Amino acid sequence: MSASAVGQGRNVVVIGTQWGDEGKGKIVDWLTDHAKGVVRFQGGHNAGHTLIIGGKKTILRLIPSGIMREGTVCYIGNGVVLSPEALFREIEELETAGLEVQKRLRISEAATLILPYHVAIDKAREARRGAAKIGTTGRGIGPAYEDKVARRALRVQDLFDPQQFAERLRENLDFHNFMLTQYLGAEAVDYQQTLDDALAFAPRLAPMVADVSAELYAVNAAGGNLMFEGAQGTLLDVDHGTYPFVTSSNCVAGAAAAGAGVGPGRLSYILGITKAYCTRVGAGPFPSELYDNDNPARQDQVGVRLANVGKEFGSVTGRPRRTGWLDAAALKRSVQINGVSGLCLTKLDVLDGLESIKLCVGYTLDGKTVDILPRGSDAVARCEPVYEEFPGWNESTFGVKAWDALPEAARVYLKRVEEVVGIPIDMISTGPDRDETILLRHPYLA
């Protein structure tokens, strides 16, 4: 029996099925009309969600995209690593734009804090790795998660016990400063400055701190719908991605339950977001890659065109994204891991005007043909893509709002994607604005 059948609201999880940057922010914003609240459950301010509303561009890094909808309550769950400095910088940007933020934002008391020493370690490690760097954003996300797993992290609730916070901070800094100075060859982080700055955030945070898990339960019990907004993408998941070229958190749908404190049985529908092609930022294997700005051997002109037409630059880092054909074999892996109910395909219009379009449906790996992305980055790096080729279309799909209005060649391509991955495409995004969307099946009504 569904959650809605027993009087509870429906919960939709929106996750990326690629290497991030799939266009989740717009889709979350589009669906927020049907949700009482929007929840971030993992990651930190290392991923930007870009929204274009009424022609105005807004980039959100930490606060859920639902903040752009008046009256929607936004939640930051216990699975998020929180930089108070980044949070208030983002709040100020939004409030300057005329949005009411602090009265609509709830922050889990159990969220882990990102503090200056996490940032220092992140940057020092990448500098030490040199050419072998992973490509982190340098914002302290990974080191903060390390502290959480090591059970030494300072959490939001610790800010409200200054004496205990000071004692634990000193212990942490003794450890991290030793690592910074003796191993990484970097400068130590000042204890007193870190303490003073952190405690200064406490009174500003206090009105927003809540038992998020209990509040989410209450919203559902009253019949309210919730949306869980994933950051990054499945192929960057710390367990299921192309390890070690991954982020430091679980980006899969199952993380919504643990990272927000809700029962997994209350997740009603999983919406997987995928571009009509693939992109990746930073290092790591990418079987269907065509273009990499930093690699002279990867300068295919179709890939260059995808990057330029798709404006493929990181919204947080500004780094050029690597581009390639849609990898349906990798998408199939993501669909299985997440239990995806339906797909939303974004940026279809970027393919307009191509003479032909290729779809990766499998790989040749060590002399064998496989139809799903293998586990482990070494195996993925050895994969040679197996493509199916489709005729392109010259008609514009930009802003199209109905399936039947799409060019026949586009419909054929999309139907083949459905066949390969084994689930339906329920939504198609044909432009950055809210209304540039084709709806085939509504996640809250499915």
Swiss-Prot record:
EC number: 6.3.4.4
GO BP, one annotated term: 'de novo' AMP biosynthetic process
Active site residues of this protein: 21, 49
Residues the record lists as binding GTP: 20-26, 48-50, 321, 347-349, 429-431
Pathway entry: Purine metabolism; AMP biosynthesis via de novo pathway; AMP from IMP: step 1/2
Coiled coil: none
Main location: cytoplasm
Residues reported to bind IMP: 21-24, 46-49, 137, 151, 232, 247, 319
Gene Ontology molecular function terms on file: adenylosuccinate synthase activity; GTP binding; magnesium ion binding
Record CDD domains: AdSS
Cofactor(s) of this protein: Mg(2+)
InterPro entries: Adenylosuccin_syn_GTP-bd (IPR018220), Adenylosuccin_syn_Lys_AS (IPR033128), Adenylosuccinate_synth_dom1 (IPR042109), Adenylosuccinate_synth_dom2 (IPR042110), Adenylosuccinate_synth_dom3 (IPR042111), Adenylosuccinate_synthetase (IPR001114), P-loop_NTPase (IPR027417)
Similarity comment text for this entry: Belongs to the adenylosuccinate synthetase family.
PANTHER family documented for this protein: ADENYLOSUCCINATE SYNTHETASE
Function: Plays an important role in the de novo pathway of purine nucleotide biosynthesis. Catalyzes the first committed step in the biosynthesis of AMP from IMP.
Assembly information from the UniProt record: Homodimer.
Name of this protein: Adenylosuccinate synthetase 1
Source species of the chain: Cupriavidus pinatubonensis (strain JMP 134 / LMG 1197) (Cupriavidus necator (strain JMP 134))
